[in-house]
Structures are given as structure tokens and as C-alpha cells.
Amino acid sequence: MDPSQNPNIVHATTIISVRRGGHVAVAGDGQVTLGHTVMKGNARKVRRLGREGQVLAGFAGAAADAFTLFELFEAKLDKHGQLTRAAVELAKDWRTERRLGKLEALLAVADKETSLIISGTGDVIEPEDGIIAIGSGGAYALSAARALLAHTELDAKTIATEAINIAGDICIYTNRNVVVEEL
């Protein structure tokens, strides 16, 4: 749903995951918007998951729904111990459990080897170029990250941070208060 169509939904963020040089970084902005009002500027939408923090995850969408998905995904990760298997098992549940079908959120998850998007329809998508960008500023961040990867020697963490900053300059639902995690 377009954020402007329902002013009562908490929405809009930008999350990006970038791989370079054997490292992966996931970054997100800190803005939470309700309707046309910024409610919070320093939300933490990127977290480490798993027993040893071996998976990075970021969310876009309704905050309460995203926290529910974080919890469910982490339970699957603890049970299966492997990112792809946990994502597929969560996606199966998302498609079959009635309460999950109504959740309005996307997850971007990454470990040392794999990056995945878990979509609101229960799809699990692996990007072909190792970059994930979701949320209202996702297209801007994706474009910035691709350009920085192609034309600089910057590391994954710096590219992810700069991509969020560029998106924050363009997208009104994204700010420059960046939280970034790296493996």
C-alpha cells in the first residue's frame, strides 16, 4: 500500500544490505512516520539475530508486524540453525497461518554467505547481485549502492551507510540517522 493512502498506518523506512570483500552490512534509517508526521527519528530497524548474532536483519513496514516477524524468524533460526532454511520455514508459516497473512512487513536478512528478502506474501527472494534494498527509499538506496560498488573501492559498511544517507536526502519517509551492522 502506498503510505499516503492510509494516514493511520505507521510506515516507511529504508533498509539496505550490501556485500563486498567477504563482508556484509545491513543498514537502516531511524525514521518512523504516522501519516504525514514523523513520530520518531531514532528507531532501530536493524538487529543481530541468532544465538551468536550471526544473522543481520532489517525490517520495513508496520513496526508491530515487523517485531512479530523478527521474533518468529529468530525462533526458526534457533530451531534450524541455517538462514535459508529458517527463511523458507517462516515463509511457509506466513502463507499458511491466518494471523501471519495479515502482517504488513518485509524482512531483509543476511549472514556471511546469503542475503534474502522475506516478503509480505511469504516469498523468499535472493538478489542476483548481493544487494537488498526495501522500503520507501529502497530504489534510491539501491541505485546509490550499485553506483558506489561499481565506481569506488569503499567497503560494504560505508556503501550501506552512504546509500541510506542518499535515500534520506531524496525520500521524505527516510532520514539520515543510520544504524548499521556488519559481519
Swiss-Prot record:
Allosterically activated by HslU binding. GO terms for molecular function: metal ion binding; threonine-type endopeptidase activity. The keyword Cytoplasm applies. Belongs to the peptidase T1B family. HslV subfamily. The keyword Metal-binding applies. Na(+) binds at residues 168, 171, 174. It is found in: Cytoplasm. Its EC number is 3.4.25.2. This is ATP-dependent protease subunit HslV. GO terms for cellular component: HslUV protease complex; proteasome core complex. Keywords: Allosteric enzyme, Cytoplasm, Hydrolase, Metal-binding, Protease, Sodium, Threonine protease. Protease subunit of a proteasome-like degradation complex believed to be a general protein degrading machinery. It catalyses: ATP-dependent cleavage of peptide bonds with broad specificity. One of its GO terms (biological process) is proteolysis involved in protein catabolic process. A double ring-shaped homohexamer of HslV is capped on each side by a ring-shaped HslU homohexamer. The assembly of the HslU/HslV complex is dependent on binding of ATP. The active site is at 13.
